[in-house]
């Protein structure tokens, strides 16, 4: 499958006439198709949901498109939580995964009913003290161990020592 740009050079030149540079152009059709593709690929897994990392592209229009395609958001800060809330994400639409989390961030995640993903089990007491324990709580897990280095058909290398990684 040959990957072609969604925007021709001529189209880009036309846009430049009306829009100051630099600027970003997004492919809504491509974004929707990719969201549908990933949801279809994991449709065998009842309850699967893709959570888009807001930090990757904190653009309300893109977040709204992903919401319409059934995706949730993965937030790591108060700002990302507030942006997601403004875009209509609440409750299980939000996965909150944060390091060295300030109290205000944790309170907001709890207030929104987000799935809260903790770095380790010791954070449970902190969460309980500052916000309370939600109905669902998650904890990152690093399986450790050593695995033989391999390569996928696409040429991607597989990590061989998850114990060396922050979260496996």
Where are these regions (language model features)?
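A charged N-terminal "starter" segment
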Residues: 1-115, 121-135, 150, 165
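Generic structural motif
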Residues: 57, 142-144
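ATP-grasp fold ATP-binding core
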Residues: 136-142
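Short secondary-structure boundary segments
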Residues: 120-121, 141
């Amino acid at each position: 499958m040959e990957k072609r740009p969604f925007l021709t050079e001529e189209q880009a030149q036309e846009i430049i006439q009306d829009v100051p540079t630099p600027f970003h152009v997004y492919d809504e059709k491509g974004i929707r198709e990719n969201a549908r593709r990933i949801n279809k690929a994991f449709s065998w897994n009842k309850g699967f949901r893709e959570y888009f990392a807001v930090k990757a592209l904190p653009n309300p229009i893109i977040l709204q498109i992903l919401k319409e395609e059934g995706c949730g958001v993965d937030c790591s800060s108060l700002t990302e939580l507030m942006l997601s809330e403004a875009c209509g994400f609440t409750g299980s639409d939000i996965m909150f995964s944060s390091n060295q989390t300030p109290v205000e961030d944790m309170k907001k995640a709890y207030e929104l009913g987000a799935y809260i993903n903790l770095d380790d089990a010791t954070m449970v007491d902190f969460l309980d003290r500052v916000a309370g324990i939600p109905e669902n709580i998650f904890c990152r897990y690093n399986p450790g161990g050593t695995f033989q280095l391999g390569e996928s058909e696409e040429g991607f290398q597989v990590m061989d020592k998850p114990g060396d990684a922050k979260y496996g």
